[in-house]
Amino acid sequence: MIFNTLSAAEMAALPKELQLDLLTEFHLLPEDLDHLDAERFGKVQRSGHTLYRYRAKEYRIYFEKHPQGVLVHRVLHKNTIRDFLFRSNLPMDADSEDAHLGETKEFWKLIDEGQKNR
């Protein structure tokens, strides 16, 4: 598992016990991405770029398949996403959250911010 600078900082800002809980819960290999539990995982897509979302406790972990494993872009509290959807005037239906996120430029700016800080 590879964290970019921004996602590493987001994890480091959490209490140590919560960090351990999230990392214990979020353990997967790139080949696991072919058989995901739809209740915990989602996909956010745009222009052929696929990010995956994992629901861990009150957090959302956004990541992608990487040649060296799994690259984590962001670790966000679920209310951060809800606030983002609210500010973007998007529906807050959990079932369509990923589809709506994939269509918004602001979400991809949030992800790109993490890539620039590697």
How does the language model describe each region?
Residues 1-26, 96-118:
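Arg/Lys-rich, positively charged N-terminal/basic patches that mediate binding to nucleic acids
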Residues 21, 52-55, 60:
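Short, cationic motifs built from Arg/Lys/His that form the positively charged side of catalytic pockets
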Residues 16, 27-31, 77:
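Short, intrinsically disordered, mixed-charge
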Residues 28-55, 110:
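A short, surface-exposed loop/turn module that caps and links secondary-structure elements
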Residues 1, 52, 70:
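A broad, low-specificity signal marking well-ordered, structured residues that form hydrophobic/aromatic
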Residues 59-60, 64-118:
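Enriched for short, Lys/Arg-rich terminal
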Residues 6, 28, 33-36, 68, ...:
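Short, functionally important structural connectors and interaction interfaces within domains
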